[in-house]
């Protein structure tokens, strides 16, 4: 189980199926990001702001789809609510990464416990 923001999800980075889903969703996100609009260099004009909104919308969708792909449909709404900002979803992605590292470290300790020197 992975605990994120007081919610528990049936996900364990040491479970082959869960790790496969994590890797597959990450690969899907990478492929979709290749066709996402580029981040505009200038956002000081109305056209620049419109381009920034398009870029931001695409990346929020990429990240929320990644989270829902890993933890199940609706997971992102449970974690962030229906109004999702880029900064909020990026913070959540950081939390997911930290939680996965913690799970991996816990398994590593168990492995070392039973591995001969």
Feature locations, PLM:
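Short N-terminal mixed-charge amphipathic segments
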Residues: 1-52
């Amino acid at each position: 189980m992975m605990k994120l923001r007081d919610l528990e999800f049936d996900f364990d980075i040491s479970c082959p199926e869960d790790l496969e889903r994590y890797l597959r969703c990450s690969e899907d996100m990478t492929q979709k990001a290749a066709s996402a609009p580029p981040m505009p260099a200038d956002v000081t004009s109305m056209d620049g702001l419109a381009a920034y909104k398009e870029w931001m919308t695409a990346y929020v969708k990429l990240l929320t789809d990644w989270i829902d792909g890993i933890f199940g449909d609706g997971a992102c709404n449970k974690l962030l609510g229906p109004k999702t900002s880029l900064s909020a979803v990026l913070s959540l992605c950081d939390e997911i990464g930290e939680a996965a590292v913690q799970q991996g470290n816990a398994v590593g300790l168990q492995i070392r416990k039973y591995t001969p020197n």
